[in-house]
């Protein structure tokens, strides 16, 4: 068992039947140039596959979990979830940067922690897991390492509902939009909680809560935007 397989098994309980796929997912092209004795490929083909797999699995997850959401809501969240900035974040959380096989020059340049490479490696791993074990295994992995971030408000960072709400409301003319903190609970410093309501011309149109005022405001804007968007 190679070190990559050992780490992935310890962290996620995943054991690849085809360990060559796993090595390929973590192999950068310059590494192969410096190790001509290795006959494998770099990660790029698996990255191509993983991109499509992520699109499908995330779309299916959202479709199943949110039966009341309209197509526009599903699309907005899917776009937020499958963009590259989120992939680099989760690749770091999963510790994937430890396993990348880099050429010496890339190692010295700091590529191991480069967002663009980590984004690619995340997709390549997803592609490798799909080829080795199928969509169900990918879903199980994402359910542990990716989907919980929805409830943590992580992906809302990539959807600017405050701007979307402002643009929608101002189509009818000038309006006064205000966000007010209605309640806050700081009893547990590790789990602060804020409740925010958004007002338009002194009328409440949406509320939201979260671990920070910023997240609560975004959720209030999201609720208001979804309620006032024409169906």
UniProtKB/Swiss-Prot annotation:
Q: Which SMART domains match?
A: DSRM, RIBOc
Q: Where is the active site?
A: 51, 123
* A GO molecular-function descriptor: ribonuclease III activity
| Class of the enzyme per the UniProt entry, highest EC level | hydrolase
Extract one GO cellular component term from the record: cytoplasm
Enzymatic reactions:
Endonucleolytic cleavage to 5'-phosphomonoester
Give the RNase III domain ranges: 5-134
Q: Which residues bind Mg(2+)?
A: 47, 120, 123
State the source organism's domain of life.
Bacteria
Q: What is its EC number?
A: 3.1.26.3
Protein task: Digests double-stranded RNA. Involved in the processing of primary rRNA transcript to yield the immediate precursors to the large and small rRNAs (23S and 16S). Processes some mRNAs, and tRNAs when they are encoded in the rRNA operon. Processes pre-crRNA and tracrRNA of type II CRISPR loci if present in the organism.
Q: What is this protein called?
A: Ribonuclease 3
GO biological process annotation, one example: tRNA processing
Sorted keywords for this record are: Cytoplasm, Endonuclease, Hydrolase, Magnesium, Metal-binding, mRNA processing, Nuclease, RNA-binding, rRNA processing, rRNA-binding, tRNA processing
């Amino acid at each position: 068992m190679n070190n990559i397989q050992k780490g992935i098994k310890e962290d996620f309980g995943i054991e690849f039947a085809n360990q060559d796929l796993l090595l390929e997912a973590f192999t950068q092209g310059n590494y192969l140039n410096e190790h001509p004795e290795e006959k494998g490929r770099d990660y790029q083909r698996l990255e191509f596959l993983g991109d499509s797999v992520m699109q499908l699995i995330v779309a299916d997850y959202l479709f199943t979990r949110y039966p009341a959401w309209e197509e526009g809501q599903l699309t907005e969240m899917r776009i937020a979830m499958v963009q590259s900035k989120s992939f680099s974040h989760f690749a770091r959380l999963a510790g994937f940067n430890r396993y990348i096989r880099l050429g010496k020059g890339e190692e010295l340049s700091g590529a191991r922690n480069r967002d663009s490479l980590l984004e690619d490696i995340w997709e390549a791993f997803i592609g490798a897991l799909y080829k080795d074990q199928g969509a169900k295994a990918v879903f199980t992995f994402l359910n542990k390492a990716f989907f919980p971030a929805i409830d943590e408000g992580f992906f809302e960072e990539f959807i600017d509902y405050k701007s979307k709400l402002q643009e929608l409301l101002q189509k009818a003319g000038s309006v006064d939009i205000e966000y007010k903190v209605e309640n806050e609970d700081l009893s547990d410093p590790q789990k602060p909680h804020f409740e925010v309501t958004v007002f338009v011309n002194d009328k409440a149109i949406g509320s939201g809560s979260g671990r920070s005022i910023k997240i609560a405001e975004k959720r209030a804007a999201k609720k208001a935007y979804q309620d006032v968007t024409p169906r």
